Amino acid sequence: MAEEYYSLRSERVTQLLVPNSESDSVSDKSKAEQSEKKTKRGRDSGKHPVYRGVRMRNWGKWVSEIREPRKKSRIWLGTFPTPEMAARAHDVAALSIKGTAAILNFPELADSFPRPVSLSPRDIQTAALKAAHMEPTTSFSSSTSSSSSLSSTSSLESLVLVMDLSRTESEELGEIVELPSLGASYDVDSANLGNEFVFYDSVDYCLYPPPWGQSSEDNYGHGISPNFGHGLSWDL
């Protein structure tokens, strides 16, 4: 009896344990598959950027398409060598079909995108192709703004330098003392000296005879006697 009891108990224990082991193995397998999918998805997303309406072909090209409004069909936009080109094509088609409610990959380029002539699939494809081959203007605008800011900064620095130089020159000119004119002072002094002083050389006048045509009476006006020469003789 005891042996039968232990055998039945062991069988029941194995029956209870086997399903649990199978379920554990199944759960472990599902977890491993999920983690592998997440890892693969992470590797795939890290290789290239992900854009709305853009898919990658097996041979490395990028395709873009968009669903027509209120229809099950899609508008084929084309195959492109880069994901950015396909994303710009999708943005043009989305703007044409959905308007302001469209979700864009490059919202900053919305104003520069070409517009289709009509909402027909052919016109949308033409506009999308133009947008795909257009050059992005974000880098150009950023470089232009930086260069303009540098030029404005350099012009401001040059203006400040010119102002400093002009201020220095004005200060140096303010320190110069205005001197009187030499010619004017000379004329005034000479006139005053002419009025105050008279030069008279009596010795020269006595030694040299008077000019021709001048009488001896004229010498009286100068205080010279006509017999001045005779007065110098000595009686021996």
Swiss-Prot record:
It comes from the Eukaryota. It is found in: Nucleus. GO terms for biological process: ethylene-activated signaling pathway; positive regulation of DNA-templated transcription. PROSITE patterns: AP2_ERF. Transmembrane segments: none annotated. Residues 26-47 have a biased composition (Basic and acidic residues). One of its GO terms (cellular component) is nucleus. Probably acts as a transcriptional activator. Binds to the GCC-box pathogenesis-related promoter element. May be involved in the regulation of gene expression by stress factors and by components of stress signal transduction pathways. Belongs to the AP2/ERF transcription factor family. ERF subfamily. This is Dehydration-responsive element-binding protein 3.
